[in-house]
């Protein structure tokens, strides 16, 4: 068991009966429990979740929106978080001690968040301090563990989302000369470049070799990027863009900034999940779009805008596998367990970690 979590030892695997229930019966039971529990139950759902789950969300949004919703909700006793592990951790840290945060399936993790563990990060900070002294401030994408957020908090740094990355990177440079950006190198690189920092003033820290990779003068380095990435957005390529340009020259290409620099540079637009949703929403009827982000969201956008021609930038994309672990059976299981007065898959972050991580989260939330 992780030192950051205290999971109730009741039943950790989905009981067999949920595999045999019909969709109609499961949906009926979820509605019954939601109605019965009223405001004591709150279900936030990330945009990348399946439709079968999102339909029951009390709030749907990207990571920033859900962080803000979690921080403002004081009424619900139970928060059943339909997202991935780091999001549930964030919800637990921003809510009161009396509120219980539950993740329907504990296997719903994030490969990007796992690419930066606290031991690697502490070691990297020590080595980088030897090179650059007290000139660095850490920023972490919210797609990171509570321990990494806490590291940033106690070292004067903050969290960022894809919605506010430019704002937070700009703030970071008012604090220190250099920025260490974890764990997604692509969001960090794309954001810094948009703010006018050339690529040769960026370096990449490889946590597996404990080495700094750079092309320019080491004294000129302003941004140190952690060598991590999103496994979903890594699958969008310049070749995908070339194919769209060739076969559909009048199609707009919009991607998430977790895509690599080359893909973002070759696209027409790049922005957060909310940015993509809003852009398509406001686009004229008949417009054509190729979207480079998670497939559940792309399919939902397609369904919501039948008046527009919308495709995935990569025709062979699949949904985020860890997000997809949260499904209707796991949601119902979590709710029925609460109904019986029991608790499963409780996310409870260590108190000291919470205090330090909240410093980083609040430095972000007070600026957005």
Curated annotation (Swiss-Prot):
Residues annotated to bind [4Fe-4S] cluster: 110, 230, 320
Major site of localization recorded for this protein: cytoplasm
GO terms (BP aspect): 'de novo' NAD biosynthetic process from L-aspartate
Keywords, comma-separated and alphabetical: 4Fe-4S, Cytoplasm, Iron, Iron-sulfur, Metal-binding, Pyridine nucleotide biosynthesis, Transferase
A matching Pfam family: NadA
A cellular component term, taken from the record's GO annotations: cytosol
Subcellular compartments: Cytoplasm
InterPro entries, alphabetized: NadA, NadA_sf, Quinolinate_synth_A_type3
Catalytic reactions of this protein: iminosuccinate + dihydroxyacetone phosphate = quinolinate + phosphate + 2 H2O + H(+)
Cofactor(s) in the UniProt record: [4Fe-4S] cluster
Record's keyword annotation contains Cytoplasm: yes
Function of the molecule: Catalyzes the condensation of iminoaspartate with dihydroxyacetone phosphate to form quinolinate.
Protein name in UniProt: Quinolinate synthase
């Amino acid at each position: 068991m992780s030192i950051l979590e205290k999971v109730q030892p009741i039943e950790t695997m989905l009981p067999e009966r949920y595999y045999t229930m019909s969709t109609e019966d499961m949906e009926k039971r979820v509605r019954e429990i939601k109605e019965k529990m009223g405001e004591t139950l709150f279900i936030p759902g990330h945009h990348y979740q399946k439709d079968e789950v999102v339909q029951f969300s009390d709030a749907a949004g990207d990571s920033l929106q859900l962080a803000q919703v979690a921080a403002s909700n004081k009424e619900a006793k139970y928060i059943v978080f339909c997202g991935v592990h780091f999001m549930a951790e964030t919800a637990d840290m921003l809510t009161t001690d009396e509120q219980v945060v539950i993740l329907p399936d504990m296997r719903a993790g994030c490969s990007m968040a796992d690419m930066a563990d606290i031991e690697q990060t502490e070691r990297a900070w020590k080595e980088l301090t030897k090179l650059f002294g007290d000139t660095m401030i850490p920023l972490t994408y919210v797609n990171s563990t509570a321990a990494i957020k806490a590291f940033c908090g106690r070292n004067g740094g903050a969290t960022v989302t894809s919605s506010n990355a430019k704002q937070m990177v700009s703030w970071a440079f008012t604090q220190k000369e250099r920025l260490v950006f974890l764990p997604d190198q692509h969001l960090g690189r794309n954001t810094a470049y948009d703010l006018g920092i050339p690529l040769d003033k960026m370096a990449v820290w490889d946590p597996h070799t404990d080495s700094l990779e750079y092309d320019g003068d080491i004294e000129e380095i302003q941004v140190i990027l952690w060598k991590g990435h999103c496994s979903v957005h890594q699958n969008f390529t310049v070749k995908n863009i070339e194919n769209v340009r060739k076969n559909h020259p009048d199609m707009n290409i919009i991607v998430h900034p977790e895509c690599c620099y080359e893909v973002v540079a070759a696209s027409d637009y790049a922005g957060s999940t909310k940015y993509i949703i809003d852009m398509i929403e406001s686009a004229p009827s008949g417009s054509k779009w190729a979207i480079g982000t998670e497939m559940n969201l792309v399919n939902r956008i397609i369904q919501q805008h039948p008046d527009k021609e919308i495709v995935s930038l990569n025709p062979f994309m699949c949904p985020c596998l860890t997000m997809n672990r949260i499904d209707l059976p796991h949601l119902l299981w979590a709710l029925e367990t609460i109904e019986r007065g029991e608790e499963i898959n409780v996310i409870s972050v260590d108190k000291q970690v919470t205090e330090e991580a909240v410093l980083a989260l609040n430095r972000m939330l007070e600026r957005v």
